[in-house]
A protein has these predicted regions:
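N-terminal low-complexity, acidic/polar interaction/targeting segments
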Residues: 1-220
Length: 220
């Protein structure tokens, strides 16, 4: 898909959007309502960039975006009686911000493609990631059977890693770091390490709980 170089953008705190992911949004600010009206008349596309922390007291930019975000396609747009809108945005592609060309009435970025680099035809670590997710489910983690069932149907390794990261990674800074890694194998390794770390914490928590129960039983 050919993307325009100038793309309207929402800069959102704590939201890291990935290609292929579905992001429900409630549009209520005037600037974004105007943006939505404009894009629905054209490509139906806008980008979501996570808002980073202000780097210094001298920085004048409001809502400073990270360098890399994701452009999405509006799949559903429904206006509510109160004037707000419900939007379902599907991620299309990573993009890198080059400059801010407009702030009013809404922000527009000049961007460039930031495509994933896949060196090997087969992602060897994919099976290990899936096994780690199965273990996470058994340990009572965030992985559900629905997540497993959906991810295992994906033939594309890039979509598999991106959707798993979008669904399972809760730390915004870490999630943004995964979004910014171009090499698929490195991104997959980061995802695997996160799941294994979560599994370790869940396992230790379970062991402590069992020990406490055993101690309580001994007292009784």
């Amino acid at each position: 898909m050919n993307l325009p170089s100038l793309i309207p953008v929402m800069t959102l705190k704590g939201v890291v959007f990935f290609p292929q992911a579905m992001l429900p949004l409630r549009i209520f600010e005037n600037r974004y309502q105007e943006m939505l009206q404009d894009i629905l008349k054209s490509e139906r596309m806008f980008a979501v960039f996570a808002e980073r922390e202000i780097s210094s007291e001298d920085e004048e930019l409001n809502e400073p975006p990270f360098e890399v975000g994701t452009v999405g396609l509006v799949r559903v747009s429904k206006q509510n009686p109160d004037g707000t809108s419900f939007v379902m945005l599907q991620g299309v592609s990573r993009i890198r911000a080059r400059s801010i060309v407009q702030e009013s009435p809404y922000r527009i970025l000049e961007t460039e493609a930031f495509n994933t680099i896949k060196v090997a035809e087969k992602l060897e670590i994919r099976e290990k990631i899936y096994d780690a997710m199965v273990q996470n489910q058994k340990l009572g983690g965030d992985v559900t059977q629905d997540v497993l069932d959906y991810l295992c149907t994906l033939e594309d390794d890039i979509a598999f890693v991106d959707l798993a990261a979008f669904t399972l990674c809760k730390n915004t800074v870490r999630k943004q770091a995964m979004l910014e890694v171009q090499r698929l194998h490195k991104r997959a390794e980061m995802l695997f390490d996160d799941i294994m770390q979560d599994n370790l914490q869940l396992s230790l928590r379970g062991s402590c709980k069992n020990q406490n129960q055993d101690t309580e039983n001994d007292r009784n």
